[in-house]
């Protein structure tokens, strides 16, 4: 049975909540998944303001989840990944970028991740697909350099939710997503949570026969 690693960065509960729904979708399909958290660096940098350091500590303290820390060994151990990314200016946040740059150069040189399979889910501040789609496309540059095969969400399994113009939904064909609001205060809607479950299920259905 293939086992999926759901790899996230989440200082609040939004990406973590989405990850739990991706996991639920995998379990509905008969699979197993474990969630790992990227180490937080935002309050450790010497360039952070005192206000920024305190805000990051508070956000980290208030987060209502606890997962194992993601390491380079995790990437080697698992063959299937779902990456959860909170969009920052249409790209990885610093924590994700720091993890890739600091931990995976040797893996890239050895081709250790080549041929592994991944999907992506994201959160973005505002309604509209631009920032979340751009985040996924930019993240794919890293995956491509490592030779990781990307599996998009597409429209087949979530057509109703992706084409509904009456309900705000941060998902797109590239991957499931949610609109979190400028201050991160908007929780995922039932429609958005459903799309994440559908993506988890579809992803596992795709890999289980490989």
Curated annotation (Swiss-Prot):
InterPro entries named in the record: Flavodoxin/NO_synth, Flavoprotein-like_sf, FMN_Rdtase-like_dom
A Pfam family the protein falls into: FMN_red
Record SUPFAM superfamilies: Flavoproteins
GO molecular function: FMN binding; oxidoreductase activity
Keywords for this protein: Cytoplasm, Membrane
Gene3D superfamilies listed in its UniProt record: 3.40.50.360
Domain of life: Eukaryota
GO biological process: positive regulation of ferroptosis
Span of domain Flavodoxin-like: 4-203
GO CC annotations on file: cytoplasm; eisosome; membrane; membrane raft
Compartment annotation: Cytoplasm; Membrane raft
UniProt xrefs under PROSITE patterns: FLAVODOXIN_LIKE (PS50902)
Further details from the record: Present with 7060 molecules/cell in log phase SD medium.
Family: Belongs to the WrbA family.
Protein name: Protein RFS1
Native species: Saccharomyces cerevisiae (strain ATCC 204508 / S288c) (Baker's yeast)
């Amino acid at each position: 049975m293939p086992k999926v690693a759901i790899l996230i960065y989440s200082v609040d509960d939004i990406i973590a909540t989405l990850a739990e729904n991706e996991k639920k979708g995998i379990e509905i399909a008969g699979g197993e998944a474990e969630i790992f958290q990227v180490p937080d660096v935002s309050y450790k940098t010497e360039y952070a303001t005192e206000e920024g350091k305190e805000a990051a500590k508070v956000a980290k303290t208030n987060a209502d989840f606890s997962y194992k820390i993601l390491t380079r060994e995790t990437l080697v151990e698992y063959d299937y990944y779902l990456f959860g990314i909170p969009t920052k200016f249409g790209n990885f946040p610093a924590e994700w970028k720091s993890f890739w740059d600091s931990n995976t150069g040797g893996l890239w040189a050895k081709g250790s991740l080549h041929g592994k399979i991944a999907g992506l889910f994201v959160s973005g501040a505002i309604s509209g697909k631009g920032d979340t789609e751009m985040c996924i496309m930019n993240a794919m540059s890293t995956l491509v350099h490592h030779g990781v095969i990307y599996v998009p969400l597409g429209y087949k399994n979530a057509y109703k939710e992706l084409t509904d113009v009456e309900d705000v939904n941060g998902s797109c064909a590239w991957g499931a997503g949610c609109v979190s609001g400028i201050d991160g205060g908007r929780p995922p809607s039932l429609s958005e949570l459903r799309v994440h479950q559908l993506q988890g299920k579809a992803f596992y259905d795709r890999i289980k026969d490989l």
